[in-house]
Swiss-Prot record:
The modification Valine amide is found at V14. Belongs to the periviscerokinin family. Keywords: Amidation, Neuropeptide, Secreted. It is found in: Secreted. GO terms for cellular component: extracellular region. Expressed in the CNS and abdominal perisympathetic organs (aPSO). Not expressed in the ring gland, midgut or thoracic perisympathetic organs (tPSO) (at protein level). InterPro entries: Periviscerokinin. Its main location: secreted. This is CAPA-Periviscerokinin-1.
Length: 14
């Protein structure tokens, strides 16, 4: 649950 970014990418963090 939550969120994060890596460079130009965003992904749902587990």
């Amino acid at each position: 649950g939550g969120g994060g970014t890596s460079g130009l990418f965003a992904f749902p963090r587990v």
